[in-house]
Amino acid sequence: MYFPNSKRPIPASCGLPKTKEVFLTTDDGLNLLAWYQPAKNKNSSTLIYFHGNAGDIGMRAKKIKPYIETGLGVLLTSWRGFSKNPGKPCESGLYSDGRAAIDFLLQKGISEDRIILYGESLGTGVAVELASKPYFSPAAVILEAPFTSAVDIASWRFPLIPVRHLVFDRFLSNKKIFKIGSPVLIFHGYLDKTIPITFGQQLFNLGKTPKTSFFIKNAGHNDLYEHGALNQIMEFLGKNNLISKSGK
């Protein structure tokens, strides 16, 4: 379920010369690497990016760069056990890592109504968990290639094995998404063989308005940005007054 990469590149080597390394302290005492680029304006929003179950922090640099260029702040996180971070990844641990990212921004005076949660694949489970809490209402939630639950994914991958009782990290987004009152965007590729699009569609149907979706015919799991996803994300952000309508 988790495939940590120990690589720990620096922002400048990934095309982000003004982005700084910071460390997020979790409630169980871990200090985790993140990359932080403050918003150009003090009143602009900041996007927290929760990545998927593999790779390292630097592999998401190209994806966050356009958001920085619009003037948004970006906090690109890395999970415990990834990118040479201490700890071992698990469901409760990743939730703690996500809370640490929110706390980091709140301590900088960035209010929750200026925080955008962005989850990629596994990271969607963390984004949904955090946004579903009654005490936290982010500006928006963006879910890239999400799933209904880790249990459903395991059952799909191993249909002949009773895995539902064997999966301990469950990430039950299907039991939480209806609690989110913030604007939600879900997008997915029809050719996704890692998390089939049906899971993203089911999750979208379970959410409440305001919600938006787009599904890309020729995209798989990792190439959504190569098939026009960015433009539609920018349109969503513009409609919710989180960037200018021109995306600049």
Regions found by a protein language model. Give the residues of each.
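Short alpha-helix in the alpha/beta-hydrolase fold that links the catalytic acid
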Residues: K63, S173, S182, P196-N205, ...
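Catalytic histidine neighborhood in serine/cysteine hydrolases
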Residues: Q201-N222
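Primarily recognizes the serine-hydrolase "nucleophile elbow" in alpha/beta-hydrolase
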Residues: F104-K108, D113-F158, F168
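An N-terminal hydrophobic leader/cap segment in hydrolases
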Residues: M1-T25, K248
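Acidic catalytic loop of the alpha/beta-hydrolase fold
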Residues: L191-I195, H221-D223
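Post-His helix in hydrolase/transferase enzymes
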Residues: L224-K239
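Membrane-embedded segments
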Residues: D27-F104
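Short beta-strand/loop motif that positions the catalytic acidic residue
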Residues: K179-G181, I186-H188, D192
